[in-house]
Design a protein with these regions (language model features):
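C-terminal accessory "lid"/substrate-recognition subdomains
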Residues: 149, 161-215
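Conserved beta-strand/loop subsegment of P-loop NTPase cores
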Residues: 38, 93-94, 118-127, 147-158, ...
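Short histidine/acidic/glycine/proline-rich micro-motifs that form metal-
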Residues: 132, 159-160
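A short alpha->loop->secondary-structure connector
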Residues: 111-118, 143-144, 170-180
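Short, hinge-like loop/turn segments at secondary-structure boundaries
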Residues: 55-58, 112, 141-143, 171, ...
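Nucleotide-state-sensitive switch-loop elements of NTP-binding domains
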Residues: 7-13, 18, 22-136
Length: 215
């Protein structure tokens, strides 16, 4: 019989300059090795991963666009996602919403997709540890939504931060998300496998989904 394989949906959110690109590149290179991937980014996507890198990683590339299969989340997202799954049958679809996108909206858009072959696998938010406080104050609605709905929060630019500053940032994040796995170790010091196992922790994922359903 035909192998029925689920396509995992991995969502990476975060503000411009937070380090999403670096993280996604690392995951593509090291953790998703040998898997069939499709990358979907918003029309404001700033991933800037060049076509060469994607081709090397064997990621499906859409000639019309410099880089990857991009489809705007503004357009008919469900149709686009179903088409990608039908055409390419990927192991994973990586979604990178725009920096100011609300993570909850993206999760809901994926949940609305009527396709049994799709499983919402993880939603990770990358947070620039140096700007944590400022973003909460100035972009509260969007930033807090990304923090509150994350199953895993990866803090970036933590290399030169003092312990005090670091724990202040973790405390702020904890106020908005009590259950997410928070990674404060510099991404460069972790293996992609370590990152993946933290991102894919199912218990936090279930809690986030249950909480979203209540809203």
């Amino acid at each position: 019989g035909r192998c029925f394989c689920m396509t995992k949906i991995d969502i990476y959110s975060g503000f411009l300059g937070a380090g999403k690109t670096t993280l996604i590149k690392k995951m593509i290179k090291e953790a998703y090795h040998g898997q069939k991937l499709v990358l979907i980014e918003n029309e404001f996507g700033e991933i800037g991963i060049d076509g060469g890198f994607l081709a090397e990683a064997g990621i499906q590339i859409n000639e019309m666009n410099s880089g990857c299969i991009c489809c705007s989340l503004k357009g008919n997202f469900e149709k686009a996602l179903n088409m990608v799954i039908h055409d390419y049958a990927p192991d994973r679809v990586l979604i990178e919403p725009s920096g100011v996108g609300k993570l909850s909206d993206v999760i809901r858009a994926v949940q609305a997709v009527q396709n049994d072959a799709v499983v919402l696998n993880m939603f990770t938010t990358v947070v620039d540890a140096n700007k944590c406080k400022m973003y909460m104050k100035n972009f509260g609605e969007f930033f807090n939504d990304q923090v509150e709905n994350a199953g895993c929060i990866v803090m970036s630019h933590t290399e030169n931060m003092s312990e005090k500053k670091l724990s202040e940032c973790v405390e702020l994040l904890r106020k908005h998300n009590a259950t997410a796995v928070i990674i404060s170790t510099p991404v460069s010091e972790l293996t992609a496998e370590q990152l993946l196992s933290a991102m894919e922790r199912k218990d936090t994922l279930a809690e986030e989904l249950a909480r979203l359903a209540e809203e």
